[in-house]
Amino acid sequence: MEAGPVRWVSFTHVFFDCDGTLVGVEGIVELTRRRGQAMAVAALTEAAMSGHLPLEAVYEQRLALIRPTRAEIQELIRIYREHLLPDAAGVIHALHACGISVHLISGGLEEAVRGLGRFLGIPAQRIHAVRPRYDPFAGAWWRGEEGPAVGVEPSPLIAQDGKARLLEGFRAPGRRLMLVGDGITDLIAQGAVHLFAGFGGVFHRPAVAENAEVYIRCPRLAPILPLALSPERARALQGTPAEGILREGLQAFRNGEARFRDPVRHERFLQVWHAL
């Protein structure tokens, strides 16, 4: 917000990370539990998401440790749904009701992320994830059964700056882009969007907490609604269950569970919403 009249402009597009943001797990770690490699993969994942190792250095290394089958990746859809944050579906439904274009942008495996997106009512063309490459000869190929995933198709999302590069392609006159995520790849994309909200409700990553323009500490996504909507746009939620989620989100900003890095901007944001 600029100096002058206090106002907040609605966003046109909101991009959510998946693992550690919409859901309370890291999918790649869940895939390892049957392989006895959970600790090794969790350590690699945390190193990448905290910025200690570049994502491209660990992505295929993690996949090689577990070599998941298509059936196991499909099983992730169930795991994602079981660990979906309690208000995630309500927040996304409210954004849709207000005409916001909601996208998922994730370094996760495409089939699982798309399955979650279907459950949340997000069209496939708004889901951006990594497509695995299967070994067609390692399984029961004579019955049409593929072998395990042995790599991934080329994608910017397996690189540390991949989300930033992908989001740059969405910038256009009249669009306002917002990104919500918990990891270093999300933080790196901060310059590609008009607002980045770091999410620490599942995993606390110090670099994200210290550098995100907005940081959310609570294990809820309700603060996204007042960030994404203007008070005028939010009138569409009056009298619906989403109005309660909006109020919860504002309360998080008032009690410090969500905050702007710039305290002046934080106060001006609260002024915009003082009537609710």
Model-predicted segments: where are they?
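Alpha-helical substrate-recognition element adjacent to the catalytic core
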Residues: 2-131, 135-136, 219
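Acidic, Mg2+-coordinating phosphoryl-transfer loop and its flanking beta/alpha structural elements
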Residues: 106-107, 174-216
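Histidine/lysine/aspartate-rich catalytic loop segments that bind and position anionic ligands
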Residues: 122-156
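Non-catalytic pre-domain segments flanking phosphatase-related domains
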Residues: 1-18, 25, 37, 244-276
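A polyampholytic, Gly/Pro-enriched intrinsically disordered region
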Residues: 143-159, 220-223, 233-246
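Short, charged, surface-exposed secondary-structure boundary motifs
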Residues: 135-141, 206-213, 225-229
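Anion (oxyanion) recognition and catalysis
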Residues: 96, 118-121, 171, 191, ...
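Conserved Lys-Pro-Asp/Glu-containing loop-to-beta segment of HAD-superfamily phosphomonoesterases
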Residues: 151-185
